[in-house]
């Protein structure tokens, strides 16, 4: 069986010379395929006598086992070579400085909202919430805004297509109505209802977009209703809040007469800083006023017995003033170079 030994050595040499899996399979076919050299020898066993067939068959099987072992060894070597090449291509230079995980942080408007909530919670207010998709009744009618009011125009308000009485709320004031109605449903059977003291942070929508306006922006609504709530209470709450928010006792606050359909009397709130880049300039901050009797009635509250004040301010505007940002749109563009300054 010297020829079988030579065949095994020849196959092992061809397997070792195969540079890849394709060449290895081609070499395998020459020995173990249907017309391979070893397969042909197996086919010739039928021509031998029984005793010779037994001896020759054992030798051929031994040679086949040796060839298959050489084949599998080469396959494993090729797999390892591929892995080594892959690892070399993906190798990391452990001497290079590491890249740490980027530190995240709250959005500056989120920081402002949290600060506003904390300051008002400290004086007994609770945070309320309401839907951003509102009915015309909650957004306008119940807030004493008549049907012919310009704010109802499609030029100022986003209405839902196919639903003339459904819109994206233009302010957080509808939550005033929802809060009062819920309050009356809960405490209306009592001789005297507890006070309502809520703030309503949230997103609102108007048809507007420029450096100081966005079609989506934030607003914080405030409402205090009780048996003896006055405009003096409103002035005290707002002035105290603004000085704490801007962390200065030198802040000047003034209330300028204005008009809102849902408050009477109404005022615009302006502030003036005594130092810094904005020193001496009066800047509009918020709108406020005593809740209009009609709004109290729509909320199910007797205006002959209860009074209240409401205010609305823009956290986006407050954030711009607090951090010295000149373009409101920067807050919503998602530019990490800008946002990372507020970590």
UniProtKB/Swiss-Prot annotation:
The keyword Transmembrane helix does not apply. GO terms for molecular function: ATP binding; magnesium ion binding; phenylalanine-tRNA ligase activity; tRNA binding. PROSITE patterns: AA_TRNA_LIGASE_II (PS50862). It catalyses: tRNA(Phe) + L-phenylalanine + ATP = L-phenylalanyl-tRNA(Phe) + AMP + diphosphate + H(+). This is Phenylalanine--tRNA ligase alpha subunit. Its cofactor is Mg(2+). GO terms for cellular component: cytoplasm. Transmembrane segments: none annotated. Tetramer of two alpha and two beta subunits. It is found in: Cytoplasm. Mg(2+) binds at residue 264. Belongs to the class-II aminoacyl-tRNA synthetase family. Phe-tRNA synthetase alpha subunit type 1 subfamily. Keywords: Aminoacyl-tRNA synthetase, ATP-binding, Cytoplasm, Ligase, Magnesium, Metal-binding, Nucleotide-binding, Protein biosynthesis. It comes from the Bacteria. The keyword Mitochondrion does not apply. SUPFAM superfamilies: Class II aaRS and biotin synthetases, tRNA-binding arm. GO terms for biological process: phenylalanyl-tRNA aminoacylation. Its EC number is 6.1.1.20. CDD domains: PheRS_alpha_core. Binds 2 magnesium ions per tetramer. Its main location: cytoplasm. InterPro entries: aa-tRNA-synth_II, aa-tRNA-synth_II/BPL/LPL, Phe-tRNA-synth_IIc_asu, Phe-tRNA_ligase_II_N, Phe_tRNA_ligase_alpha1_bac, Phenylalanyl-tRNA_Synthase, tRNA-bd_arm.
């Amino acid at each position: 069986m010297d020829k079988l030994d030579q065949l095994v050595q020849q196959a092992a040499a061809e397997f070792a010379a195969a540079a890849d899996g394709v060449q290895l399979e081609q070499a395998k076919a020459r020995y173990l395929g249907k017309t391979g050299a070893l397969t042909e020898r197996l086919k010739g066993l039928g021509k031998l006598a029984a005793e010779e067939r037994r001896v020759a068959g054992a030798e051929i099987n031994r040679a086949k086992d040796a060839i298959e072992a050489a084949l599998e060894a080469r396959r494993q070597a090729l797999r390892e070579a591929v892995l080594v090449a892959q690892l070399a291509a993906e190798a990391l230079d452990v001497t290079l400085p590491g890249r740490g995980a980027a530190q995240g942080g709250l959005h500056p408007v989120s920081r402002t909202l949290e600060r506003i909530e904390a300051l008002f919670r400290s004086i007994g207010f609770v945070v309320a919430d309401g839907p951003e998709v509102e009915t015309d009744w909650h957004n306008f009618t119940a807030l004493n805004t008549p049907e012919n009011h310009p704010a109802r125009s499609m030029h100022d308000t986003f209405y839902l297509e196919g639903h003339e009485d459904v819109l994206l709320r233009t302010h957080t004031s509808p939550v005033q109505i929802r809060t009062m109605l819920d309050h009356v449903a809960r405490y209306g059977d009592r001789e005297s209802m507890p006070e309502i003291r809520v703030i309503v942070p949230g997103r609102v929508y108007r048809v507007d977009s420029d450096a100081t306006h966005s079609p989506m922006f934030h607003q914080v609504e405030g409402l205090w209703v009780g048996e003896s709530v006055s405009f003096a209470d409103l002035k005290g709450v707002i002035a105290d809040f603004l000085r704490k928010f801007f962390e200065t006792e030198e802040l000047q606050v003034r209330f300028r007469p204005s008009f809102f359909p849902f408050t009477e009397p109404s005022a615009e709130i302006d502030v003036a800083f005594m130092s810094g880049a904005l020193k001496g300039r009066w800047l509009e901050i918020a709108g406020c006023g005593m809740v209009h009797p009609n709004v109290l009635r729509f909320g199910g509250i007797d205006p002959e017995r209860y009074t209240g004040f409401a205010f609305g301010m823009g956290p986006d505007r407050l954030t711009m003033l607090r951090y010295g940002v000149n373009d409101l749109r920067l807050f919503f563009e998602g530019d990490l170079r800008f946002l990372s300054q507020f970590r």
